[in-house]
From Swiss-Prot:
Species this chain originates from: Sendai virus (strain Fushimi) (SeV)
Domain of life according to the entry: Viruses
Matching InterPro entries: Paramyxo_C
Compartments (UniProt record): Host cytoplasm
Keywords from the named record: Host cytoplasm, Host-virus interaction, Inhibition of host innate immune response by virus, Inhibition of host interferon signaling pathway by virus, Inhibition of host STAT1 by virus, Inhibition of host STAT2 by virus, Interferon antiviral system evasion, Viral immunoevasion
Composition skew (Polar residues), residue ranges: 51-65
Region (Disordered): 12-34, 51-71
Name of the protein: Protein C'
Entry PTM: Y1 and Y2 proteins are produced not only by alternative initiation, but also by proteolytic cleavage of C'. Only alternative initiation is detected in vitro, whereas in vivo cleavage seems to be predominant.
Membrane in keyword set: no
GO BP term (any one): symbiont-mediated suppression of host JAK-STAT cascade via inhibition of STAT2 activity
Domain free text: The disordered region at the N-terminus is involved in C protein self-degradation in trans. This self-degradation of C protein may play a role in the regulation of viral RNA synthesis. The disordered region at the N-terminus is also involved in the host STAT1 degradation in order to counteract the host innate antiviral response.
Gene of this entry: P/V/C
An example Gene Ontology CC term for this record: host cell cytoplasm
Amino acid sequence: MASATLTAWIKMPSFLKKILKLRGRRQEEESRSRMLSDSSMLSCRVNQLTSEGTEAGSTTPSTLPKDQALPIEPKVRAKEKSQHRRPKIIDQVRRVESLGEQASQRQKHMLETLINKIYTGPLGEELVQTLYLRIWAMEETPESLKIPQMREDIRDQVLKMKTERWLRTLIRGEKTKLKDFQKRYEEVHPYLMKEKVEQVIMEEAWSLAAHIVQE
């Protein structure tokens, strides 16, 4: 059959051969063009999918702008921890020492005058003698046994300082009134029930400061 086709091709006029050759060449070009077009479309589609995948992917923290950077968690925790940190002991001491400074001007003057008399005048000597006798006669506790064993000058100084602390605790704030005075005593009452020596000293401070409180 192939020989018959070849024989027919040989017998075919030359102009017809040219037409067939041109047609065959055109078909080959059209086929090659379609293949290139399909390949180009496929490449574009792949590039599009790759681009979409990149845009949809997560961005690493290092590529974020500075104003959108992720917060540093350890610093946040450290800040929260510092906000809940307990006050230092020295801060508590300073707060107690400044209680008397918060009183009204008149009460502050009377309070400082009273404290000065305790440290320098006969009132202080009378106070420490009264406190010593009351502590000596009270029910024995570790603190009540320790105070009589102190050297006399040290014991007197300790009792005066404890009295001053209670005076500044009771007389503070904007013009202390009798109801405030009573309320402050009630605040410290649970503590005084456990510390009997402090209760005796506070009661003497109460007695000394009563005239400062305004009705």
